[in-house]
Amino acid sequence: MKVTKPRFFSLICALCLVFGTVVPLAARADAPTFTVGWSVYAGWNPYFYMQKSGILKKWADKYGIVIKVQRFDYATSLDSFVAKSIDACTMTNMDALDMPAAAGVDSTAIIVGDYSNGNDAVLVRNGLSFGTLPGKPIMLVQKTVSEYLLERGMVLNGQQAQLSKLRLINTSDSDIVAAFLNNKSNQAVVTWKPLVSQIATDKSVHEIFDSSKIPGEILDLLVVRTDILNTPDGQRFAKAITGAWYETVAQLAAGQPNAIKYSAAASDDTVDSYKEQLKTTALFSTPKAAADFATSPALQQKMDLVRKFCFTHGLLGQGVKSVDDVAIAYPNGAVQGDKGRVRLRFNAAYMQAAQQGKL
């Protein structure tokens, strides 16, 4: 049968439509895939909205990759990152040092998201104070910033000599609220919002210390394995997730209703509760603010406190004989510790690229 020109043109169009859809899908099936772990926290909940809104997919598509975000309990997210089950993870500066870095997993912070400015707190019952805490059971997620906050509170309240008498009860963040509230014999707990707010609904509980007393010491980061970041695909991932992050937080900072609604929903919170948490989260809502902090002397000063805490508490790994054995590298080329043993790196390049509109 002879094909006339109009029908031939229609056939060509049909083939273009078929192959135009099939080919990209086939390419996407082979696209590099990256998984980001996150856990419930005011400064990390935006990853949920980022995925829900399509912002993440838009940026991943731009760089020809697939990015998945997966929610974890906090300690489990760190374990998964150390085990190399995920490629990137939200974590604090201290945990970046005492978990992956201490375990020998060379890691790089590419986004400095915020610092806790009252989100982390020490809460007690029965009128306890730092002077009467020693010997009492204290519920917290051990080897995290909760333990750091507790010690800083003790030191700043003149109780450094009593540190060895603290009795710590390791409790998962997913269990800590119910475990504390359902047993009145539990007298002290250290955790973060929204868990702090939930515990504080008990009128017998009051706060004796929070992270606003130590501004900039508890940082919330996105950390990527350095071996991944050193590959072309890993660099595309870093650009995509950074671009998606700053588009997301710009909406959050502007009060965009869906940004707040879904970020609140990420932790089963109300919008009002989430807004209250944001008040005690010093969010670096622009890449310039984040890059400026990441390249400032203040970061190195804060990290020096953190690394000394980690070493004193044996959190830098077995056989570590000096605080310098797990070194930290900064954007200006400075290194705290042995230059041959750098395991944690702060890289401002992607934040700066976002600032310059080059992502």
Residue ranges and their predicted role:
Residues 1-5:
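N-terminal secretory signal peptides that target proteins for export/translocation
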Residues 10-21:
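Bacterial N-terminal signal peptides
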Residues 22-29:
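Sec/Tat signal peptide C-region and signal peptidase I cleavage site
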Residues 48, 97, 151, 197, ...:
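Predominant activation on well-ordered alpha-helical scaffold segments within soluble catalytic domains
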Residues 230-319:
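Secondary-structure end/capping motifs
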Residues 307-359:
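Conserved C-terminal helix/tail region of periplasmic/extracytoplasmic solute-binding proteins
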